[in-house]
Amino acid sequence: MAATILQTRDLCIGYAPKRRPRVEVAADIGVELLKGELVCLLGPNGAGKSTLMRTLAGLQKPLTGEVHLEGRDLHGLTESERARLLGLVLTERVDVGNLSAYALVALGRYPYTGWDGRLSAADEEVVRWAIDAVGARELAARSVGELSDGERQKVMIARALAQEPAVLLLDEPTAFLDLPRRVEIVQLLRRLAGDRDRAVLLSTHDLDLALRCADRLWLLPPDGPLQTGAPEDLVLSGAFQRTFADVEFDPAIGSFQLAQEPEGEVSLVGEGLHALWTARALERAGFRVAEDAPTCVEIIRDNDDTVWRLHTATGDRVCATLYELVKCLKTDATA
């Protein structure tokens, strides 16, 4: 079994402002992070994800309880010791002036350099490795200010990797990225976690991607204890649905649905990829696919050509596209 790198015991997180009552965000948190794992921290807005990430990173103290990093109390470590064990990538955009991407990544070596900050040949080798690990070699000479959000995020991850940490913590690393870049970053993190000497924990609002990619989920509901398990276990137990009760999740297909008034039922005749995407188009438009429904859609394929024949009580129509098919069904439904 993989070794535990990070562990919490009876952890209570929140804020303790001076001269005011403390604010408890979440309590009774007892979790562990194992080598080789990619873990996603999920929860609604306000549940305390960022507070938990900052507490695990040592940026704020817990109200009560303990955080252990490789068996040692996190707050008993020096700043240099902590930086050698834990790499952190935050959501906030950091102003780094005119630094090149290479120079920014090189800052990750500060726990290992002397008072003058000079890099040794070994340090330079680690910096190049970190840049290559995230696929950013072509970005190394460019100014950080010229990079896109996705490119910049790669460089920030490389900077954390240059610390050679046992744990990589990332707070909303895909928050400002488009879908292809989000997938790219999560695939990168999954590959980095595959290194048995490293664990990766990221908080995210991208629920679909977390369900597909995470080895485990940490679910932080707004009114209950943190729960942990494989994505499939948490769906089967109902914990995932309870945590996100304000959105409609279909456990049969493992994805979120738009809540809408049903337009009617349609039977579907066809197979393969065209049938799959036809069913998706129908469901998106509010029509439930049912085997015995009187309204029927038949997929007719002739070599590379495809049409959809719509059979209704008022007659048959042939539609050249799914857009046309949905428009016809909606017209009939409102007639």
Enumerate the language-model features and the residues they cover.
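Conserved ABC ATPase "signature" region
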Residues: 121-139
